């Protein structure tokens, strides 16, 4: 049996500095033609930027999660081989996150994989909150005709969330405004 990631659940997900803890989760968007788009994302647990995301009409694989991790790393630090210091990577217990090759890759690039307690989605409340916000403020107003149309809108939605969407926890700044110290 594969070893499970260590768990944390200290009741607080947010941290006081960027690039200390990142969280990740996924969600599904149902299209009017019955197609489904599955999205996984990573958030910084301080500034709440959606640093990276992946989307597919199939299942979220461990390979897509490894791509997601690498994109987050490159978003924050440029083209580097690994994080300049260990960064916690908080996820639920989905198979794409707990797969041995995903956990090994995370460690190889300087991420410390941590999982929430089983049956405890509130343990990753920041990611859960992002999903609610994204579905309420973007998906609900988007063109959901088919998967191709939805996937074409995702870059604009994520960019708007990062550049414009205010957060009460960030004194009503957007994630990138907060990250830039504006």
Regions found by a protein language model. Name each.
Residues 21-76, 87-88, 116:
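A short, conserved beta-strand element enriched in hydrophobic/aromatic residues
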Residues 26-29, 45, 93, 129, ...:
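Generic detector of well-ordered alpha-helical packing
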Residues 14, 107-111, 132-182:
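C-terminal domain-tail junction helix/linker
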Residues 1-19, 120-121, 174-182:
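Basic, flexible linker segments flanking DNA-binding modules
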